[in-house]
């Protein structure tokens, strides 16, 4: 059991929560429109030999929004992670990512393998890609979504319970899990509550890699990697696994009960897999499911 209270911290534009005081660091990266509370359920089970850092990605949770003239491109999250590690003077770390956070994690590990001690991907692998024939449509949709946002006003909800119930329904998670995510993503408003999330997060991306580009960017990941899939998870993730498993030299697959947020639904089961992977005998680690 963890002996440490969770600390709220900020460095530069990045807010994060941390617990533990070990020599090695574990970085946790959440999914799209989630926040660092995504990993708080792990805290009671975490090994105290590590320093655990759950990061709020830009535009999420308590981290700063991008500047008014910027947009949220996937590749920028990878660079943001590098910037955070540099600011925090973390030379090497274990990385755990969920959903979009998993995709950020595997691309970072591909680009900066010497900084990554181990990799755990939860309900996410590879990079979301598009057909080259969809390039123009992708661009037009991105421009249209920007125009639409200019004409809209941020929605105000009567209370946090209303927003929690809505998130529970949309994400198919319990009210308790939804409340944990919503609490960190909202702020008071004179007429109720409002999301802290940057509305630009919902913009269509103006650019996506083709599948061949995505595979090229990820090919040859040498970091020992654990992929955790949910038994009732997204079918898209299973397809992504089939597409991208060849990019990893050492990839092991485990399945646990639950839906897309299985790590929050079954935190002890999930964390035990993570801990075993981080403490693995490197010489015994082999590729599975190739």
Located regions from the model:
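Gly/Ala-rich beta-loop-alpha elbow adjacent to hydrolase catalytic centers
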Residues: 97-101, 105
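Conserved alpha/beta-hydrolase catalytic His-Asp/Glu region
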Residues: 152-208
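Active-site loop/oxyanion-hole signature of alpha/beta-hydrolase fold enzymes
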Residues: 12, 54-96
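Conserved HGGG/HGGXW glycine-rich cap/lid loop of the alpha/beta-hydrolase fold
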Residues: 18-64
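Conserved serine/cysteine hydrolase catalytic core
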Residues: 188-246
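Alpha/beta-hydrolase fold catalytic core
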Residues: 1-26, 47-50, 90-91, 275, ...
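Catalytic histidine-centered segment of alpha/beta-hydrolase-like enzymes
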Residues: 258-267, 271
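Flexible "cap/lid" loop of the alpha/beta hydrolase fold
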Residues: 117-156
């Amino acid at each position: 059991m963890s002996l440490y209270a969770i600390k709220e911290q900020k460095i530069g534009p990045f807010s994060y929560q941390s617990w533990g005081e070990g020599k090695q660091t574990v970085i946790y990266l959440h999914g799209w429109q989630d926040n660092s509370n995504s990993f708080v359920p792990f805290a009671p089970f975490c090994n105290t030999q590590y320093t655990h850092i759950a990061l709020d990605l830009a535009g999420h949770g308590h981290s700063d929004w991008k500047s008014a003239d910027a947009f949220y491109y996937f590749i920028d999250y990878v660079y943001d992670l590098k910037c955070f590690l540099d600011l925090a003077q973390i030379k090497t770390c274990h990385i755990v990512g969920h959903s979009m956070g998993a995709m950020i994690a595997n691309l970072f590990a591909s680009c900066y393998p010497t900084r990554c001690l181990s990799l755990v991907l939860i309900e996410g692998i590879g990079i979301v890609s598009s057909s080259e024939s969809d390039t123009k449509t992708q661009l037009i949709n991105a421009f249209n979504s920007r125009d639409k946002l200019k004409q809209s006003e941020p929605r105000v909800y009567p209370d946090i319970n209303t927003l929690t119930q809505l998130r529970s329904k949309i994400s198919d998670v319990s009210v308790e899990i939804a409340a944990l995510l919503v609490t960190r993503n909202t702020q008071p408003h004179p007429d109720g509550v409002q999301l802290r999330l940057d509305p630009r997060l919902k913009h269509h991306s103006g650019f996506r890699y083709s599948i061949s580009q995505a595979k090229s960017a990820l090919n040859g990941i040498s970091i020992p990697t654990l992929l955790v899939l949910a038994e009732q998870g997204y079918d898209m993730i299973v397809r992504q696994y089939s597409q991208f498993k060849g990019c990893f030299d050492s990839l092991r697959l485990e399945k646990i009960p639950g839906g897309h947020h299985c790590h929050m639904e079954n935190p002890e089961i999930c964390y035990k897999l993570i801990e075993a992977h981080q403490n693995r005998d490197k010489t015994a680690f082999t590729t599975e499911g190739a």
